[in-house]
Amino acid sequence: MNKILTTFILTICSLTIFAQDKTTDELKTLSDNKQYDKIIEQHASKSKDYSAKSLYYIGLAYYMKEDDNNCIKFMDLSINKDSKDPAPHYIKASTLNYMGKYNEAIKCFQTAINIKTDDAEFYSGLGDSYYQLEKFDLALENYKKATEQNECPDRPYSMIAQIYSDLKQNDKALEAFYTAKSKISKKSNSYINALFNIGLLESLKGNYDKAEPAFVELLQLDPTDYHSYAKLIQIYYNRKEYDKAKPYKDKLYEAHKKGLLKDNLKDMFCFDQFKWNDYLIQVFERYENENKGDIYNKHIFYVIDNSDKIVLRVQTEFSPISVELGGSKYLLCANKGATHYNSGIGFNDDLKYDDLKAAAIKLFDAYIK
């Protein structure tokens, strides 16, 4: 009788394990095919006796549907049945990151890492937690550990560079962006970001011969990155290669006409920057070019001191009266505080930038004491 009972119990256990394995396989297939709604609809309500891995797949479905609370609920159920599987610890930690619960996330990432020490995603997620808490040294440590593992994702390479950039350590940031460029896929947004920052940081160092190819490559990959057009224009103006800048200016005007430009490019773009005495000069050009009978600014020179304060503005102003009288289209004027100055110097659309710049600098000399 005891042998029969034992055999019966073993048979029941075998059938249960077989059923659980079958359910897990089914859930894995559904998950691989991204059928997350189906997983939730068909399995979430009857998962009481499911295996740890099956519960994990249900939690993963909630994770992909951005249902944070249910995701954590099922990850906890999975962990309670099998605490040695790193996957639910990692997904729970990632969810806690999304919820802004970074200290809780850190503990879960650390548990996942203790179980499996060679997963780059785990270190990357832990780096994200520390980054959000502005613990940059610990974030760097974990992003760097991520890059030491096999199959490292793009993010740690980008974030190492970003942290150095945040800390104003531009030389280290530039080196890290070059490393990121060499490691990550050209098809990713991270590659575009690396190119832009290489161009930006090389420009800040005055290495325009290195900045130019970075922006050119970026625009070949993404012709809608209009900030890169402006950066290339600045490079060419710095080198007095005005003919090279013109096609990129035309692209910005075309994009403006189509309503494609946003934020600080919506009304104007910076086409030159230079140092004058102890001041930074930023020069902008506005897209407006229509005679509506009103005065408008076309080219604007901002004179900025070491505290980032604009101490003087010099601009070409469209003058409808001058045009009506057959004179110049633009008059060179200046503003200092509430005071407006008219130099009496005129320009037209065929102006030479070197002449405009020289005239503007004379006004800097006149009005900055």
What is each of the regions a protein language model found here?
Residues 17-57, 61-66:
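N-terminal leader/linker segments that initiate helical-solenoid repeat arrays
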Residues 32, 64, 98-99, 132-133, ...:
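Register position in tetratricopeptide repeats
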Residues 49, 81, 115, 149, ...:
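Structural marker of alpha-solenoid helical repeat scaffolds
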Residues 51-53, 86-87, 119-121, 154-155, ...:
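Helix-start (N-cap) detector for alpha-helical repeat units in TPR-like alpha-solenoids
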